[in-house]
């Protein structure tokens, strides 16, 4: 399973870092976790078209995780008419908002054959290559974290967690059983050093920090230094690629 981080910033863009999105490649297929930024330029640079995307998984409705759906759905509604990604949403109001924007701003109807599905907690996707389990978290209503399994590997994408105490309230509850091969964790809504205890209780093989800000960077670096020799920690930047 290969991960390419297309966007690693938090609620707003920072220099050289766009809002959240990750391309997941497994078994010759391409999937996307969150679309907080327009991923079309990055996909094009990788030689991918919307028709090459099998499924898209959105963790929660905030704009820094969904805004990139607008240009993708726009282009799939008039140019890439054969593109058929399954778009899995925590609430259908996201689709309704995109539909209204296309009709109002572009006078363009939403392509009727585009597939949007609302999911709830539990296994939300399994095509025999990639499996996604959604777990509720406390960030907001209809906010989820994902456990993505492919190629015999398990990766946790936290999405956004509870404000103030996400590592304790949410991450600790998810970080059970067989250690994750990788955990992709956010670090802007709380002190990232709150991860210390739950990470040490069940260390993932690798930990990737995303969705951090310039004002949380110092604390993220302190957390990474504390974890040295225990768990490899990477502060992600856009374009970072890793095979799990």
Question: Model segments located where?
Answer:
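Metallo-beta-lactamase
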Residues: 82-143, 150-151, 233-243
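Structured loop/turn residues at beta-strand edges in well-structured enzyme cores
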Residues: 48-51, 112, 128-130, 177-178, ...
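Active-site metal-binding loops of divalent metal-dependent hydrolases
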Residues: 8-9, 35-38, 61, 137-139, ...
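Active-site metal-binding motif and surrounding structural segment of the metallo-beta-lactamase
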Residues: 38-88, 177-184
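Short, well-ordered alpha-helical microsegments
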Residues: 40-41, 95, 141-143, 164-167, ...
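Conserved beta-strand hairpin/beta-sheet module of binuclear metal-dependent hydrolase folds
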Residues: 1-46, 142-162
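Binuclear metal-ion centers of metallo-dependent hydrolases, dominated by the metallo-beta-lactamase
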Residues: 168-182, 191-244
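Structural motif
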Residues: 29-31, 52-55, 130, 153-157, ...
């Amino acid at each position: 399973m290969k991960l390419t981080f297309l966007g690693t910033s938090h609620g707003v863009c920072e220099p050289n870092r766009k809002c959240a999105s990750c391309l997941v490649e497994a078994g010759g297929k391409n999937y996307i976790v969150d679309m907080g930024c327009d991923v079309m330029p990055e996909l094009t640079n990788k030689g991918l078209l919307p028709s090459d995307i099998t499924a898209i998984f959105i963790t929660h409705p905030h704009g820094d995780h969904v805004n990139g759906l607008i240009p993708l759905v726009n282009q799939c509604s008039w140019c890439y008419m054969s593109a058929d990604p399954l778009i899995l949403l925590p609430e259908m109001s996201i689709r309704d908002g995109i539909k209204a924007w296309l009709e109002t701003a572009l006078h363009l109807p939403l392509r009727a054959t585009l597939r949007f599905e609302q999911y709830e907690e539990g296994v939300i996707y399994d095509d025999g290559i990639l499996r996604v389990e959604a777990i509720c978290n406390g960030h907001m209503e209809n906010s989820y974290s994902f456990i993505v399994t492919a190629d015999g590997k398990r990766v946790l994408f936290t999405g956004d967690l509870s404000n103030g105490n996400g590592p304790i309230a949410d991450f600790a509850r998810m970080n059970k059983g067989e250690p994750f091969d990788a955990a992709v964790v956010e670090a802007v809504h709380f002190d990232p050093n709150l991860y210390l205890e739950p990470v040490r209780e069940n260390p993932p093989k690798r930990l990737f920090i995303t969705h951090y800000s310039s004002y949380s960077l110092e604390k993220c670096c302190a957390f990474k230094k504390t974890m040295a020799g225990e768990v490899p920690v990477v502060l992600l930047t856009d374009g970072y690629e890793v095979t799990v």
